[in-house]
Regions:
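A glycine-/small-polar-enriched, mobile loop at the entrance of the PLP active site in fold-type I
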Residues: 3-54
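Conserved N-terminal alpha-helix of the aminotransferase class I/II PLP-enzyme fold
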Residues: 32-79, 86, 100, 108
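Conserved active-site segment immediately N-terminal to the catalytic lysine
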Residues: 169, 183-194, 203
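PLP-dependent aminotransferase-like
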Residues: 77-142
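Active-site phosphate-binding strand-loop segment of PLP-dependent enzymes
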Residues: 10, 109, 121-176
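Active-site C-terminal subdomain of aminotransferase-like
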Residues: 15, 193-275, 289
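Conserved PLP-binding catalytic core of the aspartate aminotransferase-like
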Residues: 284-315
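Conserved small/polar residues in nucleotide/adenosyl-binding loops
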Residues: 337-343
Length: 350
């Protein structure tokens, strides 16, 4: 069996140990005579799967009891609408725009109320994180929104913005479980799992209980109300059962590896290997201000579209897949998500 070096932005690489365990259980999950793909989401077996997954996630992140963990569907993009539908009580929200995903989230939220773009890095092609220590936060804002790690541009908030007491909402899709996090600093953390945690099709939302109410915008669909899913334990309708099962296995793998402190150290090691190479290279260069570099996403260029294309082509021939940059920016992009071993970065550095 041949496994390539896969640098995909998502769906991304999963721990081989998890994939092998899932393969062993594919036809018969723990003696029940069926696959997790086939079992009822109301069964005792699946109840154990989803409850264990939630508890392991709580253990990893130190999630307090006054936060709900929701396993949802619809992708992170669906949250762009679900958040204002549920949280825009005053119909005002502040957005910090540091990339395409925050920009899209702000555009979607503007359909439901007033959106203030209180900081942005679009003036320099989202190559940095703006100073967020003294933001012009609207006194009527229901929340302040960020995309904490920018998959396309390779930037990361190293310090959370000063929201001046307003609820912080964060899309953490591409940095989920890559390092320790203080959940209490957020009102809502959410992300698609297909980058650091599991297969596509699952969104995890961690939301403070006081934000889960029946007081949502008029016309909000039942399925887009956080209370619907919180009250039903993420089982209001058939959940993405197999995806949750794989997420649960990844949570156990992360705990076995030593938790998020160990993951942060490992991710720093992987990123340093690649950034050090780029900084001394006469051919390649990074595109992000050093102080704001992401540990997860590393874009780089040669300065020539022709050379970029040649590199991507020859890298693929050498077994290094999915290094082409995002379609909106070009160049190359190396994804350093949590699961892969540092040997992948050694491969690209050579």
């Amino acid at each position: 069996m041949k496994r390539v070096y896969n640098f995909s932005a998502g769906p991304a690489v999963l721990p081989e140990e998890v994939l092998r365990e899932a393969a062993d259980e594919m036809l018969d999950y723990k003696g029940c005579g069926m696959s997790v793909m086939e079992m009822s989401h109301r069964s005792k077996a699946f109840a154990e799967i989803i409850e264990t997954a939630e508890q392991d996630l709580r253990d990893l992140m130190g999630i307090p009891d006054n936060y709900k963990v929701l396993f949802l569907q619809g992708g992170a993009s669906q949250q762009f609408a679900m958040i204002p539908m549920n949280l825009m009580k005053n119909k005002v929200a502040d957005y910090i725009v540091t990339g395409q995903w925050a920009k899209k989230a702000a555009a979607e939220a503007s359909k439901y109320g007033k959106v203030n773009k209180i900081a942005s890095s679009e003036d320099k092609t989202f190559s940095y994180i703006p100073d967020c220590s003294d933001l012009p936060v609207d006194e009527d804002a229901d929340y302040v929104y960020i995309c904490e790690n920018n998959t396309i541009y390779g930037t990361k908030f190293k310090e959370l913005p000063n929201t001046k007491g307003k609820t912080l909402v964060a899309d953490v899709s591409s940095c989920f479980l890559s390092e320790p996090v203080d959940v209490t600093k957020y009102g809502l953390i959410y992300g698609g799992v297909q980058k650091n945690i599991g297969p596509a099709g699952v969104v995890i939302a961690i939301i403070r209980e006081d934000l889960i109410t029946e007081d949502v915008l008029p016309g909000t669909p039942t399925m887009l109300t956080y209370k619907t899913h919180a009250d039903a334990g993420s089982l209001y309708n058939t959940p993405p059962a197999y995806g949750i099962y794989i997420c649960g296995k990844v949570f156990k793998w992360l705990k076995k590896m030593g938790g998020l402190e160990v993951m942060k150290e490992r991710n720093e090691k992987k990123a340093k290997l690649l950034y050090d190479y780029l900084d001394q290279s006469k051919l390649f260069k990074g595109t992000v201000e050093k102080k704001d570099r992401s540990l997860m996403n590393v874009p780089f260029v040669t300065g020539s579209d022709e050379l970029d294309a040649k590199f991507v082509k020859e890298a693929k021939e050498a077994g290094l897949e999915n290094l082409k940059g995002h379609r909106t920016v070009g160049g190359m992009r190396c994804l350093l998500y949590t699961s892969p071993e540092p040997t992948r970065q050694e491969a690209i550095s050579y």
